Amino acid sequence: MLLKGFMLSLVLYAVYHLASNGGQFMFDFSGQSKWERAQSEVRQAILDSWHTYEKYGWGYDVYHPIKQEGENMGPKPLGWMIVDSLDTLMIMDCPEEVSRARDWIKNDLDYTFDYNVNTFETTIRMLGGLLSAYHFSNDDVYLDKAVQLANALHGAYDSPSGIPYSSVNLKSGKGIKNHVDNGASSTAEAATVQLEMKYLSKLTGEILWWNLAEKVMQVLESNKPQDGLVPIYVNPDTGKYQGHLIRLGSRGDSYYEYLLKQYLQTNKQELVYWDMYRESVEGVKKHLVSDSYPSGLTFIGELDNGIGGKLSTKMDHLVCFYGGLLALGATGGLTLNEAQSLKSWNEEREADFKLGEELTYTCYKMYHDVSPTGLSPEIVVFNEDTSKSKDFIIKPLDRHNLQRPETVESLFYLYRLTGDVKYREMGYEIFQNFIKYTKVVNSEGEVSFSSLSDVTSFDSNGLPKFKDNTESFWWAETLKYLYLLFDDTNKIPLTDYVFNTEAHPFPRFDTNDYFKTGWRRKIDENEKAQMRESKVIDKSNLPEAQPVDKSADQEAKEIIEEIAG
């Protein structure tokens, strides 16, 4: 056993030094500009590692790059890797890889087997990935699977309040309460299915999914959260928040993200979401923002005991999405110069954008200041004590790096909106460190990438501490955002698209009398948010996918006329 471990260490040692190459890339992209080369390097990293996954882990939901083997999370595959990564391959124009993925989805993927899935994760990764793939290809295979999956997921919303249960059984459609946290659902998870469900309704003309998603938001808003800040748990039986913990990290993050993105998805026509978003931003500024010592890094803390309690200086890497979100909210997807020329530009938007830049710089420092890898840990704790010399500390249990996307996501937004090359430089530094310290090359010279268990030290052989796991969001989000960061052709224009929280781009669209928000905010205790009446749907006979040849608007009008008749 000891000999086997020693030999494995020797192999990994050789692999690591082959992969690191002194921090430089081995690819030859002569004749390209600096950022064209950077984009080509990202593309090569994606394709090299994807081909290795195709060879050793094809179809499996989980991939172990060092063992070179995969496994499924349940009795059958969910498409975790393939579906989540598909639109990245489409955006990069990889027809052969896309064709193989399509064949697998058509022939091997099925969402009707007996297995409990997380409602949120399955929605943002699988449903989101299928819908984005359909948008880029107009291939019914993807929409058919999306409808099949949505039919399986809809039972999660059959709670007394309309707040989805944390899990659902794909075969029975029965929603399942969380086994911990007293059965509560995560607030972020409940409020981060709306883009996907609404877009599916828009594509199919079926309002069921739209109404399920909107009902969640109406229930959450009826709690009238103070200053727009919400606890991270909500009870699916009552629709009331549970506990007092407020944070923009895990279980809280994407609630705030989807307030803005629902507003943008429907071309800024649903002001209720802009109002909720603006209120939450002011709440964040008032209660959660602070600065570190000695460098004055702006960070977002947590309120363990709710508003009025002491601010914890802990910040998840997950929070790093917020800098880009603030910048996107300030400009609406226009460049900063374009937005500043409008009459709607004001001190509020200026302050939002500035805060977004400051937070993104802090997140960059969470990489840059970490030795020896230059990679961010999962969580840091910022210092406000003037007697200490470091801006943040990393606790032993928080030293891992899962190759998360949030920092490069914000760098992508800020570069697109400002054109400031410093954001590309920051992103390229992070990319280089990912290549140097997470790249694994097997004896055949085949490339993979692995998460790390510790970014602050190497093992006894001087090697990175690999977790032997590749997350699907490495391809779906992190490398996609890096690819787009270095893109000079404005792929996926921010004025035309909104990215879901798993980086799947959806096109913006207009509302109409059929597809629109059917409730209004609760102004006072005596006025209840009103849900509009809608066609009663027989949930025992849900629709098969019927991709529309005509526009969804025309389809909706015909349905309305049918109901009225």
Curated annotation (Swiss-Prot):
Enzyme class: hydrolase
Biased composition (Basic and acidic residues): 526-538, 550-565
Cofactors named for this entry: Ca(2+)
E.C. number(s) listed in UniProt: 3.2.1.113
Gene3D superfamilies found in the cross-reference section: 1.50.10.10
Binding site for Ca(2+): T501
Active site: E378 (proton donor)
Cystine pairs: C320-C363
GO cellular component entries: endoplasmic reticulum; membrane
Alphabetical list of InterPro entries matching this protein: 6hp_glycosidase-like_sf, Glyco_hydro_47, Glycosyl_Hydrolase_47, Seven-hairpin_glycosidases
Keywords: Calcium, Disulfide bond, Glycosidase, Hydrolase, Metal-binding
Pathway where this protein functions: Protein modification; protein glycosylation
Highest taxon above the source species: Eukaryota
Gene Ontology biological process terms, A to Z: carbohydrate metabolic process; ERAD pathway; protein glycosylation
UniProt record similarity statement: Belongs to the glycosyl hydrolase 47 family.
Functional description taken from the UniProt entry: Involved in the maturation of Asn-linked oligosaccharides. Trim a single alpha-1,2-linked mannose residue from Man(9)GlcNAc(2) to produce Man(8)GlcNAc(2).
Protein name as annotated: Mannosyl-oligosaccharide 1,2-alpha-mannosidase
Upper lineage: Eukaryota, Fungi, Dikarya, Ascomycota, Saccharomycotina
Gene: MNS1
